[in-house]
């Protein structure tokens, strides 16, 4: 790869039925969740407790609606699949804010 070549960006995908269910249950659309994944200040950590067959991750990021959103997803080289999304708990919000204050 030439140093001038752009880095390929994985496509963000999801199941439409799961997206409708998630919106009803958590009031967060997967469209909004996808924008939280693009937050440059987002934090991502592995989520091994919720899957044995695939690597899952939890990303906490700010969405285009200026809401902090926790996104459960898989991440491979060519696509990111959103599994669920919700608003964070108080302690998750504090952790995000604390992590980003330390970067200033």
Residue ranges and their predicted role:
Residues 1-104:
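Ribonuclease/tRNase effector modules and their secretory precursors
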């Amino acid at each position: 790869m030439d140093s001038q070549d752009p880095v390929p960006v994985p496509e963000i995908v999801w199941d439409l039925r799961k997206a409708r269910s998630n919106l009803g249950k958590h009031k967060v659309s997967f469209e909004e969740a996808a924008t939280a994944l693009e937050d440059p200040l987002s934090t991502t950590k592995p989520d091994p407790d919720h899957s044995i067959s695939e690597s899952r991750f939890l990303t906490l990021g700010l969405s285009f609606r200026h809401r902090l959103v926790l996104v459960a997803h898989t991440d491979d080289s060519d696509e990111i699949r959103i599994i669920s999304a919700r608003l964070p708990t108080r302690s998750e919000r504090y952790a995000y804010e604390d992590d980003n204050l330390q970067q200033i």
